[in-house]
Amino acid sequence: MKNILKTQVHVVVIYLLIKIAFSQVKTDFDVNWSTSKMVRITNRLGDGLTLNLHCKSADDDLGLKILAPNGSWSFKFRTSIVGTTLFYCHFTWPGQSKRFDIYDDDRDGVRSHISCINCIWDISIQGPCMFSESDHAFNICYDWNGNLRT
């Protein structure tokens, strides 16, 4: 009986030590496998044009938004741990209908050369331009086919 009680005490002590060790490891080495991001879109069409936009991902439909001239809208999300996050937007204004991948993990994620945490976009008739945090300017510009403009 004494040996059984002693064994049970040892098991409990070992269990508690393991639990404490793992809780400490989580605290010290807590890796956030997904990253929090923010996308802001501003209407820079000019000529007093209103911009309608509808953004989606595979999991989220963010609904129709209507931006007055120079108006902005933003949303936040967490990226996928496998690096496949994609949000695309359908943009319309009088006489035009365009689509653009407003956040693409391959282009904007931590493994890309343009990585952004706050992905800030100006939408013009020529195409979207993203704010460069290193240059402090909207100089990462694309045409509506997704090609980088020079």
Swiss-Prot record:
GO terms for cellular component: extracellular region. Belongs to the plant self-incompatibility (S1) protein family. It comes from Arabidopsis thaliana. The keyword Signal applies. It comes from the Eukaryota. One of its GO terms (biological process) is rejection of self pollen. Residues 1-23 form the signal peptide. This is S-protein homolog 3. Pfam families: Self-incomp_S1 (PF05938). Keywords: Glycoprotein, Secreted, Self-incompatibility, Signal. It is found in: Secreted. The keyword Glycoprotein applies. Glycans are attached at residues 32, 70.
